[in-house]
Structures are given as structure tokens and as C-alpha cells.
Amino acid sequence: MDVNEVEENFFAPGDAKLHGKMCNALSVIYCKIMSIFPSLEAARPRSKSGIQALCSLHVVLEKVKNILRHCTESSKLYLAITGDSVVLKFEKAKSSLTDSLRRVEDIVQQSIGSQLLEILMELENTEFSLDPAEKEIGDQIIGLLQQGGNFESSSDNNELEVFHQAATRLGITSSRAALTERRCLKKLIERARMEDDKRKESIVAYLLHLMRKYSKLFRSEIWDDNDSQGSSSLPCSPTIQGSIDDAHGRAFDRQLSKLSSFNFRSCNNNRRSSQMSVPPEELRCPISLQLMYDPVIIASGQTYERICIEKWFSDGHNTCPKTHQQLSHLCLTPNYCVKALISSWCEQNGVQVPDGPPESLDLNYWRLALSVSESTDTRSAKRVGSCKLKDVKVVPLEESGTIKEEACESEYQEDQVTLVERCTELLTTLTDVDTLRKKCRVVEQIRVLLKDDEEARILMGENGCVEALLQFLGSALNENNASAQKVGAMALFNLAVDNNRNKELMLASGIIPLLEEMLCNPHSHGSVTAIYLNLSCLEEAKPVIGSSLAVPFMVNLLWTETEVQCKVDALHSLFHLSTYPPNIPCLLSADLVNALQSLTISDEQRWTEKSLAVLLNLVLNEAGKDEMVSAPSLVSNLCTILDTGEPNEQEQAVSLLLILCNHSEICSEMVLQEGVIPSLVSISVNGTQRGRERAQKLLTLFRELRQRDQTHLTEPQHTEVTSPEDGFSVASAAVTETKPQCKSASRKKMGRAFSFLWKSKSFSVYQC
């Protein structure tokens, strides 16, 4: 595999959100190793140490992949403050790769060993270090974290200025970028909760607090959104696996040692050593996590440090931080009993009694605040969900303004508005507005929302979006509005991406007849084909689409000059449909075999490989075999691929020819007349594993046919025996049946073909 191809498929310059220089250097080495990895596997070490070396390299490569993915999918703010730990992970990956490559170098051939040596030299010369500008940004954000822990923090204007400067330097300069950053932070919080890492959760919660607090800075920005109609791959959550280990944790601790004012503490700042007893949870404030100086009771019955709970209330909370219970009042009652218990515990354990309230607020505060906010949003979501889209107040759309402007205005509302409320608002607006023009603007907003938000697809599907969009598409067809048809089709496409439930709803709601109506409009072919591709991935949809007008339509696209993406989608859709055996007669009757003939020898690999994959599905049907044998140039094209194709294509072609030649001796004669023996011998030595096996089987088949043909030719054709009694002759070997005579004639031709091919001294019978 080519290095550039591996790199293009996995990591491209600019993918990394931060630490791009380190990522690019490591990804180049990763791609070089991956390009020769098949050769390493092909070495097939027999010794235990060799197998362990290869397995070790595979594990290290997975860790490298996870590190690069972490830098491309994680939060920019989080990457900035954990720069030191990221550098440590890169250094550890470098060390592990070096060790693994040295072990593998001993078990491979010299030619591959020289390539490994070059990679090792490049790896050893690679230095990983933080970019000074990125380190400065990280220090700025850490400074904000320190200020966020103070009860008497600096003014919001100063905080705003510092955060805006840091965010701008990180590229968070638009509403779109701010939304992406908030989503990344939420995913980090979810992972921290799964790992029960309260420190990490608290720090990320405060970063999310800052993002929410200052997202209004970006709300006036206009972003550009280009939809990819044929893309079904969506952003996935960051995967931080074994590469984040104990060493990373220690580096993270060192990085945050500067934040000692808000690290988790078991007692006050004057604690003696790490060996002293940990205070009972009942004596520590749930917010500051320290021994309480002035414990007070709130309406829920929980006890807190006075200064901490007062800040909680002053920030607008009217719930208990620990139980999330709505408080009937915000009065504070001193808890003298707990204060006495604290004094007693300190005396017994030799710990100094707190002599004042904490000077700073632990970041645990922000974790609790986020938890309360999420529980409130959940209750709001349940209330909105239970109302079933009724009695919801919606802001009507204005008559003027472009789709892009309105999408920007509604896409980024206040952070307090939940996703459920947004989905509900859009669906209700779509139902309430009366003109197709207004509906079109709403559907465009829905399309943008669904494009890269899996949760939105789920919520929209559960709340009637499928039916609403199909109704809109029907109206667009009735009014012959091409642009509305395209917008509606792409909204349905986005709704169906990676969501089988929504696909099932579309089928049940009658999407196929609407798509068949759209086939009359050439401008809609691209969006219609994209939906067919999306639906064809669903098993339940294959028989429905296979028996519709979609099959002749998509087969016709393979013949005609149309958009490349449209033709690609059609070919992939037909491949999915061909995996369902009852569809094969319909595909054959649509003349699919002839349509694929020219694509099998296309200059572009994507056409050849997928066309051969479709043919491999069709050849499993008896009628499919007959159709292929009778196709004018298909067998010739397959033989050409044996000589000029890529290894995977050669494997597919030889598999097809093996099945066809086993099915028909006529096909065997056609294949041999193409002079394929040298190509088959080459594949049997240098092809893929399956390609080698099938090339050998095909050569064996030809050898058996040749031997049978030679035996037949050497047998006496006619033997006369004279009877002594009556003196007449009897033809003991006479053959009178028509069918065997035809076979004999065919074998004579085969014999001539074989005798011609085996005259070459370069290829003996034993080579076949």
C-alpha cells in the first residue's frame, strides 16, 4: 500500500486540533510502517519470539493511532492545558515503536529490514516538544482556572479578555467552532464519569462553564456549511484507550500542580503530610471537599461551608448541590453539632482545627454546578417530550432573508435551550407555516442540524420528523419545485445516516413511491441516488428497492454520462441490492451485466473493484453465470484484469473465472484462447492468499481438461469385428447420441487450444 494513500485515508495535515507539528511527524512514521505492515505479516514468523514481536508492533501502532485520534477529536482547551502529558505520550509512543521495530527487524527479509532501518533512523531523529505559542495558551487557560477558584476573583471584563484571546488563538472564532468545542468538552466529561475521575471531570466542567459563559462572543459570526451528499461517515467520539496510562496521569498531576489552590484536598491548607488521616465525608463540605470552618444547614438538610453555599446561591442556584433537590427557601442555619465533631476529630488525629474559611473554591464546584444543570435539562427534555409537540410557542419565520442567514440565526440560540426544544421548535414550525417557501427554509435548518448530530437524528425520528419531511417532499413534488425537492431529499438522507430505525420508518411511511416520482426530474437524480444508497444498507429495504423502478434507473445511470458521485452511489447501491439473492433476477433483467462490462476495465480502481464485487454476487445465480458467459466482452475483460489489475482485482477476476469455467467448458475455451496461463502462474506465485489459491485451482482445472481431452483423442474412434459365422462387421465404439457428439466436437477444439498453449517450453504441465 502506498504511503500517501495510507496517510490520506487516516491523517491529513491540519486534522490535529492542537500539537499539529508533533502529530504530523508521528503520522508520517505511522503511515510508513503501515505501508509495509502487510509485508511484515507475510513474513509469518514461526518462532514464539517472532510472533510476539509482530503482536507487540500491532499493539503499539494501535496506541499511536489513538494518540493521533485524541489530538484530532478532543477539546482544544483540554489539549492546551494538558500539553505536557501529550508530549509524554508522544515520547512513550516513540520509545515503544523503536523497541518493537528493532524486535521485528530480526525476523524479516533483508529488503524489508533496510526499510525498517530507515524508519528507525527517522524515528530516532524525531524530537517531540510543545510549540511555545501553544504552551503560552495553555498557561493562559490555567491562569483562568486559578482565578475561577478564588472567591474574590478578578472582574468579568478581565476574564473575558483573557479567554477571548486564548480562544481566538486556538481557532475558536465562530459559533460553529464554539459549538464543536462544547460538544468535545461534554464527551470528555462523560468519559471522566465512566472512569470515576472526579478531578478530570471538575476541570473539564469548569472549561465548559467558561465556554458557555462566553459563547455569546461568537453568536454574531456567520459560518459556512457545505453538505456532503454522499458521505455516510460521521464524526465519532474521542477514543482514549490504553495510551492514557499511569504515566499520563502523573504528567497530568505535574501539569496541574500550578493549580494547587483548587486541587482536591482532604483538609485545610495547613495539613501536615500525606500520611495523616482523611477526615470523614460528613465533616467535609461537599463543595470545597475540605474540613468546614463555619458549617451551615440548608433546607434539604445537607451541611455546607457557609462561604461555599453562599456563592452557590449567589450564582443563581436554588437547588441542593448534592441531592439536586429544589429548595423551599435559601436560609442558612449554623450547625454547631458538626462544628464540635470537627474539633473533636482534629484533636484526636493531631490536625489543626480550621482557623478560617477556604481562600479558594475547589473546581469540584463546577462539577456539581454542571451536574445540576444537566439534571434540570433532563427534566425539561422529559416535559417537552411528553407534550408530543403540542402547545409549544414558536418564533415565526420572517418572509425575507436567505436560507443561510435563517439557519445561522436559529442554529445557535442560548445555551439554555436544549436540543429537544430546538427539535420540537423546528418540527412545530414546519407543521404550522403555510407556504412551501417558508417550509423550505425550516427543512434547510433541519438538514443542517441533522448533518453531524447523531442525537438530533434520534430525537427527530422519535418526534415525527420522518412523516413531516415526507409530507413536505410530497408537497414539493405536487408543486414541481426542484429546489424544495432537493432540500427535502437531503434532509431525509441526513436523518437516515447511521439510524436504522429512521430508515424503517421511511419505508413504512412510503418513501419509495415519492422517490420514483422524483426520477422524472434529472436535477434530482443525485439526491435520489444518495437516499437509495442509504436505504440499501438496511436488510429490510433490499427487497423493496429491488422490486421497484430503482433498479433499472440505477443500471441506466451506469450507461449514461452523469455526475461521478451519482454514478458511484448507484454502483454501491446495486452492490448492496445484489447481496440479497432474490433481487438477482431483477438485476439481470435490467441488463446489469452488460452495464458493468466497461466499468470492469476502467482506469479508476473504484469502478473496477466494486463492479467485480457486484459480478461475484451475480455469478452465484445460475442465470447469472449464463448471462456472463454470453456477454460479448466480459470474459475478455476479466482476462485483461488478470494481467494488468491490482492484486485485489486479480483475486476477484480469477474467482469469477474459476466459477464460470467450472460451469461451462465453452467459457474455459474462451479463457484459454485469451492466453491467460502466464498470468495465472504469476498470480499463483505473487497474488493475494485467496488469489494464489484460486489461480492454482483454475490451472488445475485446465490441466484436467487437457488430460481428459488428450485421452479422448488417443482412443480408437472405430473398431470393426468380423463374425466368423456371418462375416459382417460390428461397430463396437459407434456413438449415435447427439449430445456426446457435440461434446466430442467441443473437446476437439479444446484439444487444439491446449496443444497450442502447452507447446511453450516455459510452462510445463507441472507448473499448472
From Swiss-Prot:
Matching entries from SUPFAM superfamilies are given as: ARM repeat, RING/U-box
Q: Which CDD domains match?
A: RING-Ubox_PUB
Return the ARM repeat spans.
454-497, 500-540, 542-579, 581-620, 623-662
What domain of life does the UniProt record list for this protein's source? Eukaryota
Keywords for the protein's UniProt record, in alphabetical order:
Repeat, Transferase, Ubl conjugation pathway
Pathways per UniProt? Protein modification; protein ubiquitination
Query: Which protein is depicted?
Result: U-box domain-containing protein 45
Q: Which gene encodes it?
A: PUB45
